[in-house]
UniProtKB/Swiss-Prot annotation:
InterPro entries the UniProt entry points to: F-box-like_dom_sf (IPR036047), F-box_BR-signaling (IPR050942), F-box_dom (IPR001810), KIB1-4_b-propeller (IPR005174)
Protein name per the record: F-box only protein 7
Keywords carried by this UniProt record: Repeat
Domain F-box: 19-70
Species name: Arabidopsis thaliana
PANTHER family hit by this protein: F-BOX ONLY PROTEIN (DUF295)-RELATED, OS07G0183000 PROTEIN-RELATED
């Protein structure tokens, strides 16, 4: 029996597609195709091939607006991680490369550092789905006698951390809640990456490309760890005594860089004002390489952010009201990011601080450093337990 007309058309179309080199399309036609894509596919288009990337650079760019990673769940661990694009008011589900019941710990450009309830860590590119699995925490940890063992009783604690004679029961809440801090850095071109995360304020684990295990150095600081940032092969550690230490990871083994640390032995001295309640402290490295200490406080019913910067002449931390004309802050991100030239809505602009802690009022918004006002983002169509800012194409 001969082929039907529909079958013949389908076969002919398939042959045309196979014989046509889509990378050699006329640039004007390709530009129109790329500019018509959804925001997510628009960012994906630049990695198709070098020809597409060359055309992509000439396209009308989308606004530099942060997206949101959102979780539709009742608990800390979610089986439904989704991506929200505010420009199109669109939610992307079923993201490639993301495991069920895993949670975002840190981000770097289009990449996320993820961990699940089994303490399996991995890095994933949300736009391409490319994934890099990291060593399991149950494996041997270099430089320490600490080890993680799965608990037989999952009520409240899923893992136990043994450190010499001590043991600490670990619940999912303790690993994934907002009190934890982590940092991710990845080079899109070379694939080099660095990961660090803090557990229980006294355990700092690091891993970089080429390592066969996690590393821990308990002698880095006697006080506890508060926050981390990473730039130019150096890990910046902000401890509970308000000191900043810098460790160089450019060699085989990390070493403290005291000579090139302008913040050495210069702790932040902050006295709370009347009625102020200090909620959290974070650090962020500017594009100039200078470190900012950011305090989030609440006074009455208002959320406020105080930013401190080192005055190198006076050798002391001073509060500032500006961070530059083209930079903004994602609270907890570790680095300042490029800001849009003008206000694009939701208060996102130079000198703004995007923050989120849970997804209910008044715990998320955009703080204007110049005016002290907070803009609330539009609510989602779904009830969400958690959300985080995501910066596609900003890296």
């Amino acid at each position: 029996m001969g082929m039907t007309t529909d079958s013949m058309k389908k076969e002919e179309t398939q042959k045309m597609s196979e014989n046509h080199d889509w990378s050699k399309l006329c640039p004007d036609i390709l530009r129109k195709i790329i500019e018509s894509l959804s925001s997510l596919d628009f960012y994906r288009a630049k990695i198709v091939c070098s020809d597409w990337y060359s055309v992509w650079k000439t396209c009308v760019k989308r606004p530099l607006r942060p997206w949101r990673i959102i979780y539709r769940a009742k608990y800390y661990i979610s089986t439904s991680l989704m991506l929200f694009d505010p420009d199109e008011d669109k939610i992307y589900k079923n993201l490639v490369g993301v495991s069920d019941e895993s949670y975002r710990l840190a981000s770097s450009g289009n990449w996320l550092l993820m961990a699940d309830s089994r303490l399996d860590f991995y890095i994933v590119n949300l736009l391409t789905g490319k994934r890099i699995n990291l060593p399991p925490m149950e494996s041997k940890i270099r430089g320490a006698q600490a080890r993680f063992v799965q608990s037989k009783y999952f009520y409240k604690s899923r893992y136990i951390c043994f450190d010499n004679c001590n043991s600490i029961r670990i619940s999912e809440k303790e690993v994934f809640e907002s009190k934890r801090a982590a940092v991710l850095w990845i080079d899109e071109r070379t694939g080099d990456y660095f990961v660090a995360w803090i557990f229980n304020k006294h355990y700092l684990f690091t891993h970089k490309k080429g390592d066969d295990s996690w590393c821990w150095n308990r002698k880095w600081t006697k006080p506890g760890y508060l926050d981390l940032a990473y730039k130019n092969n150096k890990l910046y550690i902000y401890n509970t005594d308000n000191y900043i230490k810098i460790f160089d990871f450019s060699g085989d083994y990390p070493k403290e860089d005291i000579e090139n640390n302008p913040y050495h032995n210069r702790p932040l001295q902050y006295i709370r004002g009347p009625g102020e309640v200090l909620l959290s402290k974070r650090i962020a490295i500017q594009k100039s390489g200078e470190v900012l200490i950011i305090l989030r406080v609440i006074k009455g019913y208002n959320f406020l952010f105080w930013i401190f910067k080192m005055n190198f002449e006076r050798r002391k931390w001073e509060r500032v009201d500006s961070i530059g004309d083209d930079e903004m802050i994602i609270f907890g991100h570790g680095l300042t990011v490029r800001a849009p030239v003008q206000d694009i809505g939701d208060g996102v602009k130079s000198g703004s601080i995007c923050f989120v802690e849970y997804d209910r009022q008044p715990f998320s918004g955009v703080f204007d450093l110049a005016t002290g006002k907070v803009t609330r983002p539009n609510k989602f169509r779904y009830h969400m337990s958690y959300s985080h800012w995501f910066l596609p194409g900003f890296a």
